[in-house]
């Protein structure tokens, strides 16, 4: 059996290995799996909205409530509201308590089931909650030492995610601004008319119809779309006689156009 020191080293190694994949739908699955293996439990990481960021289930609990959570990738709102009010680690919550991951009706199936919740902080902000549970056997003091270390590691990783998301939002906003600024008045007018024809963020348009509708030439529309596509703001595909398929890749375009007067 691994010693506390060995387990501690396995957790701190996560920071060195860079186990998150921000391109994945659940970017922290690998990290959560490693933590669950070290602490010897089922585990998941949620953000402050209750959205699932990663999970690992080495022990199958046959729990409908938990299964539904992973299917929806979000915990019930009332559970999340209670969880974010926890400011220190809450250990070994029994099955019959509201914050137990086990449904109350499963008390007879998992009489010794316990849940431990630990808040995740980063850069002075609450970023989420680390939830762990076992069917049989409480979390010991040694386990809780590992939990405290794990939440620190998760906090660093979530801070990195938040920073990358901020940088990505700034990049998209800058690209949308630059793309719109390259358009002439007529081209901006054309793009706004095109956006109004789309069904949300994508759809198909017929350039000649829009040109006639707003009183410009078809070439103005073609030039405007070419500029936006080269800036990575939209993508387009010819549909032949049916017109052109368009998809807005950078939704910042909507705000930039809305701020212009025509």
From Swiss-Prot:
Keywords: Cytoplasm, DNA-binding, Repressor, Transcription, Transcription regulation. GO terms for cellular component: cytoplasm; protein-DNA complex. Induction: Represses its own transcription via a CodY-box in the promoter region. Disruption phenotype: Disruption of the gene in peptide-rich medium and exponentially growing cells significantly increases expression of over 30 genes. Repression of oppD by regulatory BCAAs is completely removed in codY mutant. The keyword Transcription regulation applies. It comes from the Bacteria. It is found in: Cytoplasm. Residues 1-159 are annotated as: GAF domain. The keyword Cytoplasm applies. Residues 207-226 bind DNA. Signal peptide: none annotated. Activity of CodY is modulated by interaction with the branched-chain amino acids (BCAAs) leucine, isoleucine and valine, which are signals of the nutritional status of the cell. Whereas both BCAA and GTP are CodY effectors in B.subtilis, L.lactis CodY responds to the intracellular BCAA concentrations, but not to physiological fluctuations in intracellular GTP. DNA-binding global transcriptional regulator which is involved in the adaptive response to starvation and acts by directly or indirectly controlling the expression of numerous genes in response to nutrient availability. During rapid exponential growth, CodY is highly active and represses genes whose products allow adaptation to nutrient depletion. Belongs to the CodY family. This is Global transcriptional regulator CodY. It comes from Lactococcus lactis subsp. cremoris (strain MG1363).
């Amino acid at each position: 059996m691994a010693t506390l020191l060995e387990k501690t080293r396995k957790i701190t190694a996560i920071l060195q290995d860079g186990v998150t994949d921000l391109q994945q739908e659940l970017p922290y699955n690998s990290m959560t799996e490693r933590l669950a293996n070290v602490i010897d439990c089922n585990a998941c990481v949620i953000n402050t909205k209750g959205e699932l960021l990663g999970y690992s289930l080495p022990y199958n609990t046959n729990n409908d409530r938990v299964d539904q959570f992973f299917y929806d990738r979000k915990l019930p709102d009332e559970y999340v509201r209670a969880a974010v009010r926890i400011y220190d680690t809450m250990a070994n919550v029994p099955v019959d308590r509201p914050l137990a991951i086990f449904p109350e009706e499963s008390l007879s199936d998992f009489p010794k089931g316990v849940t431990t919740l630990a808040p995740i902080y980063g850069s002075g902000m609450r970023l989420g909650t680390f939830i762990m549970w076992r069917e049989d056997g409480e979390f010991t003091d040694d386990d809780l030492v590992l939990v405290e270390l794990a939440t620190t590691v998760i906090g660093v990783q979530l801070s990195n995610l938040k920073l990358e998301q901020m940088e990505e939002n700034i990049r998209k906003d800058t690209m949308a601004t630059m793309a719109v600024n390259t358009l002439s008045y007529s081209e901006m007018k054309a793009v706004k008319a095109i956006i109004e024809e789309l069904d949300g963020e994508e759809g198909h348009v017929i350039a000649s119809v829009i040109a006639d509708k707003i009183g410009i030439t078809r070439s103005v529309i073609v030039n405007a779309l070419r500029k936006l596509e080269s800036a990575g703001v939209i993508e387009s595909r010819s549909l032949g006689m049916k017109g052109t398929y368009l998809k807005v890749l950078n939704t910042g375009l909507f705000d930039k156009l809305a701020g212009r007067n025509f």
